Regions:
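ABC ATPase "signature
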Residues: 233-234
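Helix-to-loop junction immediately C-terminal to a conserved catalytic motif
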Residues: 53
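Conserved ABC ATPase signature
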Residues: 148-152, 156
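ABC ATPase NBD Q-loop/coupling interface
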Residues: 62-85
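Conserved ABC ATPase "signature" region
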Residues: 126-143, 252-253
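The feature captures the beta-strand-to-loop junction immediately N-terminal to the Walker
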Residues: 38-40
Length: 258
């Protein structure tokens, strides 16, 4: 791990039975950078995201995280309570299905406020004001603060999940197909929102997507996966404009001819 990286992984390997999900995968992420992980279904993208975030343990290899004080931590050697605390503070996770991250029986404001309370906030007025501000930032009308998420559209649910995740200003966010399943017009609005907020807050992010256009719009760097391996990595525009690996060439070509 180099001196200034925020997150590094070396030699990540994991199989599900006889099927290799990850094969000797190396990853580096720098502060404030967005890394897109792309590839077709079954390439290992989401498995890699889950291993990097400590949700799934690899069979070999290690993931290292540098905390705000500059100390290195082996993610998979952390005690479970420490890892849970990290996910409530320095880290965030945005799921493809926002219902995995939201509490559907709790109001929109309560969903945002809970993450603040997990960090020790106790003043109701301050929590509500911050929730109102974050609803505004994700373009949800303040009048909806006391509404339950089940009354929200798919795009609104995803924006509420983003507000809940970013309200604590995490240093690192993991995103698993955040625009998947949304209408094209809703996707465009959400992508613009993600790009704006991540840049303004200087958040580092690992973004899993099957959509090369999403990667090009959002990511500084890209990692292309095929059958559990990272076959090509580099600056996003460089890789997509001049792909070197045959699989990357095929992915780019399929988009151009779609």
């Amino acid at each position: 791990m180099t001196e200034d990286t925020l997150l590094s992984a070396r030699g990540l390997t994991l199989s599900f039975g006889a099927i290799p999900a990850l094969v000797e995968v190396d990853v580096d992420l720098w502060p404030g950078e967005m890394l897109a992980v792309v590839g077709e279904s079954g390439s290992g993208k989401t498995t890699l995201l889950n291993v990097l975030s400590g949700r799934v343990a690899p069979q070999s290899g290690a993931v290292w995280y540098r905390d705000p004080a500059g100390r290195l931590h082996d993610v998979h050697a952390m005690p479970a309570p420490v890892l849970r605390s990290l996910h409530r503070s320095d880290w965030g996770f945005v799921h493809q299905d926002p219902k995995q991250n939201l509490r559907m029986a709790v109001t929109a404001g309560g969903n945002v406020g809970e993450r603040l309370m997990a960090q020790g906030a106790r003043h109701y007025g301050d929590i509500r004001n911050q929730a109102l501000e974050w609803l505004r930032q994700v373009e949800i009308d303040a009048d909806r603060i006391d509404d339950l998420p089940r009354t929200f559209s798919g795009g609104m649910l995803q924006r509420l999940q983003i507000a809940r995740t970013l309200v604590t200003h995490p240093r690192l966010v993991f995103m698993d197909e955040p625009t998947g399943g949304l209408d094209v017009s809703v996707q465009a609005r959400l992508l613009d929102l993600i790009r704006t907020l991540v840049a303004r807050l200087s958040i580092a992010a690992v973004l899993v997507t099957h959509d090369i256009a999403v990667a090009r719009l959002l990511a500084h760097r890209i990692a292309v996966m095929q059958r559990g391996r990272v076959v090509e990595t580099g600056l996003t525009d460089q890789v997509l404009d001049d792909p070197q690996h045959p699989y990357t060439q095929l992915l780019v070509s399929s988009v151009l001819h779609a």
